[in-house]
Amino acid sequence: MNKYKYILSLSLIFVFSLNAFAQSNEVEEIITTATKTEKTLQEVPVAVSVISADEIDKANVVDAFDLMQVVASLDTRQYQSSKNAAFFIRGFGNGSNNNGVEPSVALFVDGVYRSKMQSRINDLPMVERVEVLRGPQSTLFGKNATAGVINIITKKPSFEKFGKISTSIGNYNSRIVKAYYTAPLSETMAFSLNANTNQADGHAKNTVTGNDTNNRDRYSLRADLLIETADDLEIRITADYDEYDEFCCQVGNVSAGPAKELAYALGAQAAPNNPFTDQVHFNFDSFSKGENSGISVNIVKEMENMTFTSITSSRDSDSLESQDIDFDSSRILNPNTTNVN
């Protein structure tokens, strides 16, 4: 009899332990705006990954290109200059050194489309979540979303004071500083300020000029004003500015071609047959610099059976770059300088 009581007691303890474990590990409901309306992740009929702010911090995601560390099937590729880079989802995407080539992975920040690649490379502001939609999304997001969408949602200004400063250092004299502050202005208005700097020395050497290349030198500022009225009206005004000024980019050969033999015949140095080389032989330092700015007004009005949303924005981008397009120490081709507004 005592034996059966002992077994019954153990069974009850085991059942209660399972219930307590289940209650303490409830799955948090994930909200996404992948279909332009707020729905739970289970209700969205598309393939989407949602990355929270905590996941971004833990993975040390600095900019949109780092998202490939936490999102399956998302890839990024760097081309000849800082701004000539591209996103690929499930292997699909457009990448080129041609400024006229439109991307097939659309990137939105708070509902505002970033059309130029150079406006996508700056560090992320204070983020609430990032949504990555896989597959064609042109019905809701336009013609440049045939491969997918990266949708970045930033934190709204808070009516409670909050400030945060974070710094990180790394090899090649890498220094990253991020600052964020938010506070109320009145019972119906709040603001936030966000500033980022990202600097690092180059990890490759130009043997002709003696200077480093592939360095990092970027700055960004963002100001946000939130107005909430008693009649379910929300107005959010955002202004942002960022700039970059870098020597980029290092190149390497996978195998020797006839053009390389021509460079050797002219007494020039060319990139070795090593895609991971830390040396380049440009007869001048290839550089890439630019700045981006924008302002947007987001109006949301809650009605009885619907929500009215209006997003109005204006963006401006300027860039200047010069590339040694023969990739060797000779002057076979003149410097290719591009100024894009």
How should these model regions be labeled?
Residues 1-24:
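Cleavable N-terminal targeting peptides that direct proteins into the secretory/outer-membrane pathway or into
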